């Protein structure tokens, strides 16, 4: 069985981080759209149907944000696990493994527990958006 070398592992991690960042940029744009829509719902005193549609749109964005945060940790933990499988590694790689552990990444990652800070941040976003949609001015 042929294993990747240290450089290949770091390259794969960087590719994953770049992809994750691009995906998050799209989520950030859609989050801005959701806040604009929530503000519009409040300004127009919109009906229940419109508020429900904007709520569902916002929940989709929030789900994708949670998923992106979980994927980020999966990339980092997967990199640490791959580095730990090497026979020898640099001091920097060893420090990375020490920071993220040597457990294999979860196959069925939980978007709520993968990154508690990310989960808390998205909870605040959820309250902010739904507060704008469903409360009176």
Question: Where do the protein language model's features map onto the residues?
Answer:
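Hydrophobic alpha-helical membrane-insertion segments
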Residues: 53-80
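Cytosolic-side membrane-entry/anchor segment at the start of a transmembrane helix
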Residues: 2-35
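Alpha-helical transmembrane segments and their helix-start/interface "positive-inside/aromatic belt" motifs
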Residues: 42-58
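Hydrophobic alpha-helical transmembrane segments of multipass integral membrane proteins
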Residues: 23-30, 55-65, 119-126
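Juxtamembrane helix-break-helix junctions at the cytosolic face
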Residues: 36-44, 72
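Juxtamembrane non-transmembrane "cap" segments at the membrane-aqueous interface
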Residues: 71-99
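Transmembrane alpha-helical segments in integral membrane proteins
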Residues: 28-39, 111-137
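Membrane-interface segments at the starts/ends of alpha-helical transmembrane spans
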Residues: 6-15, 100-114
